[in-house]
């Protein structure tokens, strides 16, 4: 895409005092090139700089000058190059569009108190590091999180850890749904609960623990079991308490695995209501999270069908894939696998709510604890023949269930 010089200048002038983000600090390689954005794969880049003025540019973008003064500083220090102002402005614009620059002159948003800025300051700098989108303020993602309304179904091992991470991070409103009571066998992994909570509804114990963690978050909940897609639809569309602007939840997080069809139901209801959602869990040492947004890439069913084809489990026609990794009546899990699963779910929520990191939904990723360095990653295109989101008519079984 060609960007006009006037547009480039306009982008640059939105910044009062452009500064290379501290986390993206540039350095010069032995070849004289400029490496910027840190050495983290997915963030950093290398810029050729045969004449040395790009290095001067990144040095000048230290948050002490306005854009015009940055251009003047670069041209002043390289008089022999006959640099045009447009060249320098264009390079500055490239750096801004790549996400390496923040506006040191942008005041913190008035909506965030000094106490909140202190509380969430470290998280803001991590978001700033992982963010590759130009923003008016580096606090913008924190505001998005504070305005967010999230529905969490299941507050056990995965859901409890996800709730803990989101509430600590400053999510605005979390509504928790959970029917069970705390049992002794839960305590090896459900770390929101203690021995004094045995026999108590998990919902009450979780809300008490989360309120103690962060009074900034609006915490609500209901003791309820999801028995069908209608229950999920009811939960999603009847936001309680209803937000002043009348909008339902921004996001569904599914951390329940009963009944077994619950993910299929969530997929269907989220497609129908246009709700982004994520689900996480573990199967033995495999821990993963899937994140989905209607209209953006594969849905849960697309991904599941594509993965079944890819894995080629050598199943006979009609044989259910669960025979290859059976579900056990007990739940092999500890605080590590449940905690990782919940943290991945919270991470997916931040991605869907704030766009950080800029990972497109319609994928599943995670860890295989048996083989460090062997990441779990699934991504597929949206499938035309998908029975949930596809455009071709679905094949229907005699009992009316779409397949
Ligand atoms: Zn689909």
Regions found by a protein language model. Give the residues of each.
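Adenine nucleotide-associated cytosolic modules
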Residues: 1-403
């Amino acid at each position: 895409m060609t960007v006009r010089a006037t547009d480039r200048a306009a982008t640059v002038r939105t910044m009062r005092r452009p500064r290379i983000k501290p986390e993206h600090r540039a350095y010069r390689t032995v070849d004289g090139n400029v490496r910027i954005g840190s050495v983290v794969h997915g963030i950093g880049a290398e810029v050729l700089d045969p004449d040395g003025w790009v290095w001067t540019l990144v040095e000048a973008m230290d948050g002490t000058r306005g854009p015009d003064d940055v251009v003047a500083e670069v041209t002043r220090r390289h008089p022999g190059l006959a640099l045009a102002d447009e060249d320098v402005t264009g390079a500055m614009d490239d750096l801004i569009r790549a996400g390496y620059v923040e506006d040191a002159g942008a005041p913190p948003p008035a909506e965030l108190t000094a106490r909140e800025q202190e509380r969430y300051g470290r998280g803001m700098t991590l978001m700033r590091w992982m963010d590759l989108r130009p923003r008016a303020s580096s606090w913008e993602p924190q505001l998005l999180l504070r305005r967010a309304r999230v529905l969490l179904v299941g507050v056990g091992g995965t859901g409890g850890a996800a709730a803990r991470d989101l509430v600590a991070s400053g999510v605005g409103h979390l509504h928790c749904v959970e029917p069970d009571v705390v049992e002794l066998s839960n305590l090896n992994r459900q770390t929101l609960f203690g021995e004094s909570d045995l026999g108590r509804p998990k919902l009450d114990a979780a809300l008490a623990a989360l309120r103690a963690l962060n009074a900034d978050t609006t915490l609500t909940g209901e003791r309820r079991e999801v028995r069908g897609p209608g229950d999920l639809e009811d939960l999603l569309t009847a936001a309680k308490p209803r937000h002043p602007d009348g909008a339902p939840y921004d996001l569904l997080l599914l951390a329940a695995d009963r009944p077994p069809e619950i993910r299929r139901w969530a997929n269907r209801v989220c497609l129908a209501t246009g709700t982004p959602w994520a689900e996480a869990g573990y199967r033995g040492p495999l821990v993963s999270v899937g994140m989905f947004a209607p209209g953006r890439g594969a849905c849960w069913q697309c991904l599941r069908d594509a993965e079944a084809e890819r894995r080629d489990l050598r199943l006979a026609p009609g044989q259910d894939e669960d025979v290859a990794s059976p579900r056990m009546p007990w739940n092999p899990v500890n605080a590590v696998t449940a905690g990782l699963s919940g943290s991945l779910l919270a991470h997916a929520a931040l991605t869907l709510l704030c766009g950080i990191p800029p990972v497109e939904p319609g994928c599943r990723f995670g860890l295989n604890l048996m083989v460090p360095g062997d990441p779990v990653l699934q991504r597929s295109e949206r499938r035309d023949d998908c029975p949930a989101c596809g455009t071709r008519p679905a094949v229907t079984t005699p009992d009316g269930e779409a397949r």
